[in-house]
A protein has these predicted regions:
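HotDog/MaoC-like acyl-thioester-processing domains
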Residues: 63-72, 80-126
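Intrinsic-disorder/low-complexity, polar/charged segments enriched in Ser/Thr/Lys/Arg/Asp/Glu/Gln
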Residues: 1-5, 23, 58, 72-74, ...
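Hot-dog-fold acyl-thioester-processing enzymes
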Residues: 1-56, 109-126
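Short hydrophobic interaction/assembly module
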Residues: 48-76
Length: 126
């Protein structure tokens, strides 16, 4: 399973000494973009220039444990089939010291000329 580690930015820590809930989706996004690039060879910036827009249509997140100052998070990613053929679920978990801090399901698609689509390289995995 794909994973990526990130040192928690001190600017993302609130007055209570924990990561502000607003930043969890950013860490998930950074890992998701790395996942598409490193696992599938999908460069989102280059494809955007060609008119391909990879978008999150919806997401659901569960907070399990607070992330604190000076911690490192490990984000895992994998794709699962969605009920609609033009979407995929990107299932992600955030770990701190091997314990789940948060988990999320991100429903994604690729818009090409205004139409939703899933690249074949991703379809092959689900």
């Amino acid at each position: 399973m794909f994973s990526k580690s990130y040192a928690v930015d001190p600017q993302h820590i609130d007055f209570q000494g924990v990561m502000d809930g607003l930043f969890y989706p950013f860490y998930f996004e950074w890992a998701r973009h790395a996942y598409f690039s490193e696992e599938f060879g999908i460069n989102l910036d280059q494809l955007f220039e060609l008119g391909h827009m990879y978008v999150v249509l919806e997401y659901r997140m569960k907070f399990k444990k607070s992330v604190h100052r000076n911690e490192t998070v490990v984000i895992t990613c994998h794709v699962e089939k969605h009920e609609k053929p033009t979407r995929v679920n990107v299932v992600q978990k955030m770990f701190v010291d091997g314990v789940i801090a948060a988990e999320g399901n991100f429903v994604c698609t690729c818009m090409i000329k205004g139409r939703p689509s899933i690249p074949q390289v991703i379809k092959n995995l689900i």
